[in-house]
């Protein structure tokens, strides 16, 4: 019925909205981590001075400028970047999963419809993403520089 179809559309829009919001907050938290280390270490190099974008740029900044090498070594880095990639599929591809990304979705049990490769996430998936992001950031904020860096 049209009511069922409407409910399905609202549900997927809600899950997509939560995914987009979570990844935006993740990226802002990582950027904040970089700013904190810049200020605490009295560093002259800023995050914007490092090539790249998003999580990879922040990881490069933390490693090369701050001296934290463990950020990308975290046990859930691959899962976190897969969540980010799902967000990118929603934003840039209408929620359609590209064929080369399907193995990652399969590895982490992230659903998509076989017939049209549409990303299919439920509330339980969103909660798993949320918990993984919180755990990752908790560990990230505990990392300390292992090398001395000069401002």
Give short role names for the model-derived ranges.
Residues 1-15:
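Charged alpha-helical initiation segments
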Residues 11, 15-19, 122, 126-129:
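Aromatic-acidic/polar surface patches that form glycan- and anion
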Residues 20, 28-115, 120:
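Flexible secondary-structure boundary motifs
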Residues 21, 25, 82-85, 89, ...:
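Charged, amphipathic alpha-helical oligomerization/scaffolding segments
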Residues 103-151:
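Amphipathic, Lys/Arg-enriched alpha-helical patches that create a basic surface
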């Amino acid at each position: 019925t049209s009511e069922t179809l409407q409910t399905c559309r609202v549900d997927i829009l809600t899950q997509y909205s939560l995914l987009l919001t979570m990844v935006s907050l993740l990226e802002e938290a990582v950027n904040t981590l970089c700013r904190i280390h810049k200020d605490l270490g009295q560093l002259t190099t800023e995050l914007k001075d490092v090539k790249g974008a998003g999580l990879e740029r922040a990881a490069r900044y933390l490693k090369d400028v701050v001296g934290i090498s463990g950020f990308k070594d975290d046990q859930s880095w691959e899962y976190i970047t897969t969540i980010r990639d799902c967000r990118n599929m929603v934003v840039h591809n209408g929620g359609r999963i590209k064929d080369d990304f399907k193995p990652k979705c399969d590895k982490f049990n992230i659903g998509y419809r076989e017939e049209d490769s549409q990303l299919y996430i439920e509330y339980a998936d969103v909660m798993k993403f949320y918990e993984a992001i919180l755990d990752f950031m908790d560990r990230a904020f505990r990392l300390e520089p292992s090398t001395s860096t000069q401002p």
